[in-house]
């Protein structure tokens, strides 16, 4: 979904063309394993007239990346390289080659050519005409792309168009059904635009099955071309329901569709005998020691104390797990930056004295797309509380740096921009608080929310602490020993606050209702000592003060 944010320049660059090479890599997510929707970004290829390449496997992904750079440089146009989940998550041995970077390097000079680079109407109109001509030529010539091809038997009367990873599924399905000498397989790695020569190869067989992940984009192009040339071929795929319009494909699903077209009997392989047993539920949880847990715990307590039922506008990050019990502090999760944006509208229509609006957003997401909606909140006077969860990194996707980390993607130091600087610059009152300090959190959140309710204006709280995974890594690097915590047997009353309300994964309930801490899971954050009403939790031994410093300040290296 990241290409949505870059769509505006993509359309414009398609008009102007590029110097050097520009390859946009888009990782689509069929079945939405980690995305909020299942969009197929090949539509951008059609919409913006951008050549779209789909690798069929790991080696192809390597070759496709090289070829994408070469074609972009040769055509002087942007190229979209599309991957899907199985391609992105597959490993295999690679045959490495050499990319001639010198050949791909731009000149390093800016060519003053306003008629090309300024998209005012009189120039943009000319660009569109050239773009349409380029697109027509590309449809005629792109069939010779090295990763395209035709294999199998011509004149068999049945063709499979395998697109990207769909080509691999198609080959396995053909083998499973024993149709190797009875089918023509058309391998399409340039899915947009569909090469006309490959389309003709498929249509000549009379029966065609299009296998592609995502939307029926190649299928739609093929059907349009068939109408254009008057072909009577029957084309099957997703539009007729033979293949599913949602989720990932599987060999079994493709084999069942192929068997149906070929008139074969085929029973899809099912799982083993149903023993009537269910695996124990394993819901995703925030890590032991995660700074989000004390924030959400404190937020719930403050809302209860002020006798309000907030509407929580969430965002994209590890903190999306706040939707789950016992916290349930995510009522809306739409897209990156959607928290403050949604809160803007809600704050104007809800009775905030009973249902105050609280936006929850991470630091990297705030820099990415949270600043503009906060500006709108100021401009439109939206009474909302925005909580920026600052863990000094982009945790969910692999600890990438951002403008608040003081480090660039190449590892070099960079100016560090605190969220508070930005918020103050927008004229918004901002509070900063230690995310591991329960008392400080509750006091700060209560003051901030009360100010929103009384003064009806936006207020921001920045809750700060390190991602526990980064902190643990830093501690190991420094040779620091992490001291776990334990339950003091005689003091625990079995109230359940630590394992039910605070819900630390390292703490469990014993048969007698008392708490028990697993030292293998405990990260030594010590927040449980603050939430226990009976002072029944303590460290196993002396805690090195350096650890508490690292917990609050560690950043990825």
Task: Briefly describe each language-model feature range.
Residues 55-292, 435, 446-447, 455, ...:
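Flexible, low-complexity linker and terminal segments
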Residues 31-34, 323-462, 468-474:
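Thiamine diphosphate
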Residues 1-65, 71-74, 82-87, 107-108:
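Active-site cavity-forming subdomains of large catalytic enzyme subunits
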Residues 1-4, 26-32, 58-59, 85-87, ...:
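Acidic, glycine-rich active-site loops and adjacent beta-strand->loop/helix elements
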Residues 269-340, 349:
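Active-site diphosphate/adenylate-binding microenvironment
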Residues 27, 46-54, 277-282, 320-333, ...:
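Glycine/charged-rich beta-loop-alpha catalytic/anionic-binding loops adjacent to active sites
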Residues 23-27, 80-84, 161-162, 211-212, ...:
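Short beta-strand segments
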Residues 1-3, 26-28, 54-59, 187-188, ...:
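Active-site nucleophile and cofactor-binding loops and adjacent substrate-binding regions
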């Amino acid at each position: 979904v990241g290409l949505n944010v870059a769509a505006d320049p993509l359309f414009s660059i398609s008009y102007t063309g590029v110097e050097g090479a520009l390859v946009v890599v888009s990782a689509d997510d069929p079945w939405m394993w980690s995305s909020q929707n299942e969009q197929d970004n090949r539509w951008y290829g059609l919409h913006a007239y951008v050549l779209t390449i789909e690798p069929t496997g790991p080696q192809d992904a390597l070759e496709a990346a090289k070829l994408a750079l070469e074609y972009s440089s040769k055509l002087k146009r942007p190229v979209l390289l599309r991957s899907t989940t199985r391609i992105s998550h597959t490993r295999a041995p690679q045959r490495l080659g050499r990319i001639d970077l010198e050949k791909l390097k731009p000149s390093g000079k800016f060519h003053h050519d306003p008629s090309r680079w300024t998209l005012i109407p009189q120039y943009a109109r000319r660009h569109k005409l050239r773009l349409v001509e380029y697109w027509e030529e590309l449809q005629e010539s792109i069939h010779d792309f090295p990763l395209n091809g035709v294999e199998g038997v011509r004149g068999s009367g049945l063709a499979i168009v395998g697109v990207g990873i769909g080509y691999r599924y198609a080959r396995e399905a053909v083998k499973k059904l024993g149709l190797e000498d009875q089918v023509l397989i058309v391998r399409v790695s340039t899915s947009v635009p569909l090469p006309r020569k490959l389309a003709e190869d498929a249509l000549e067989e009379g029966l065609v099955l299009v296998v592609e992940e995502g939307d029926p984009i190649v299928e739609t192009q093929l059907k349009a071309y068939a109408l254009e040339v008057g072909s009577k071929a029957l084309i099957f795929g997703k539009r007729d329901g033979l293949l599913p319009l949602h989720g990932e494909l599987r060999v079994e699903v493709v084999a069942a569709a192929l068997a149906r077209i070929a008139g074969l009997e085929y029973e899809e392989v099912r799982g083993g005998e149903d023993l009537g047993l269910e695996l124990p539920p394993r819901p995703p949880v925030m890590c032991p020691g995660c700074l989000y847990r004390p924030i959400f715990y404190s937020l719930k307590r403050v809302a209860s104390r002020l006798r309000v039922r907030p509407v929580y506008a969430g965002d994209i990050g590890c903190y999306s797990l706040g939707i789950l019990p016992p916290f349930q502090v995510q009522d809306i999760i739409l897209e990156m930056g959607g928290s403050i944006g949604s809160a803007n509208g809600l704050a104007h229509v809800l009775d905030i004295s009973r249902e105050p609006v609280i936006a929850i957003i991470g630091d990297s997401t705030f820099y990415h797309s949270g600043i503009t909606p906060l500006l709108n909140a100021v401009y439109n006077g939206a009474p909302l509380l925005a909580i920026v969860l600052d863990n000094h990194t982009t945790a969910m996707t692999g600890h990438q740096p951002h403008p608040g980390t003081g480090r660039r993607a190449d590892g070099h130091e960079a100016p560090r921009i605190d969220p508070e600087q930005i918020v103050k610059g927008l004229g918004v009152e901002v509070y900063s608080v230690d995310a591991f300090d329960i008392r400080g959190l509750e006091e700060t959140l209560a003051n901030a929310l009360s100010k929103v309710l009384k003064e009806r204006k936006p207020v921001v709280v920045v809750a700060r602490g390190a991602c526990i995974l980064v902190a643990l890594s830093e501690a190991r690097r420094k040779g620091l020993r992490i001291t776990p915590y334990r339950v003091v047997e005689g003091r625990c009353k079995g109230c359940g606050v630590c394992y039910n309300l605070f819900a630390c994964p390292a703490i469990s309930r014993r048969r007698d209702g008392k708490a028990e801490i697993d030292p293998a899971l405990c990260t030594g954050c010590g927040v449980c000592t603050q939430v226990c009403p009976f002072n029944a939790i303590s460290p196993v031994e002396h805690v090195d003060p350096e650890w508490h410093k690292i917990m609050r300040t560690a950043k990825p290296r």
